[in-house]
């Protein structure tokens, strides 16, 4: 994975690198490989992730149809 450092701006390059790694799922992969996960635990985790995905899709569908109010946008304090 490559990141260009422009004008010696290392902070920006690190942010870009971190964002790329996040998109590629590298942090999740490193966490998963840090310790052995039993096959039964893996199945349970994957099943839980699938349930969360389905709930999220159902919630979004209800919001699109107008049966649920849309979530409120968080206002940042500056």
Swiss-Prot record:
Single GO molecular function: structural constituent of ribosome
CC terms in the record's Gene Ontology section: ribonucleoprotein complex; ribosome
Annotated coiled-coil segments of the chain: none
Keyword Chloroplast: no
Biological processes annotated in GO: translation
Transmembrane segments: none
Compositional bias of kind Basic residues: 53-62
Disordered as annotated region, ranges: 30-78
Keywords: Ribonucleoprotein, Ribosomal protein
Compositional bias segments (type: Basic and acidic residues): 30-52
PANTHER family: MITOCHONDRIAL 28S RIBOSOMAL PROTEIN S21, SMALL RIBOSOMAL SUBUNIT PROTEIN BS21M
Family the entry assigns: Belongs to the bacterial ribosomal protein bS21 family.
Protein name: Small ribosomal subunit protein bS21A
């Amino acid at each position: 994975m490559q990141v260009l450092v422009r004008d010696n701006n290392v902070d920006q390059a690190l942010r870009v690198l971190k964002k790329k790694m996040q998109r590629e799922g590298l942090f999740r992969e490193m966490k998963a490989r840090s310790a052995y996960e039993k096959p039964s635990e893996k199945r349970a985790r994957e099943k839980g992730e699938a349930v969360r995905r389905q709930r999220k899709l159902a919630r979004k569908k209800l919001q699109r149809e107008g049966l649920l109010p849309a979530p409120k946008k968080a206002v940042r304090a500056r």
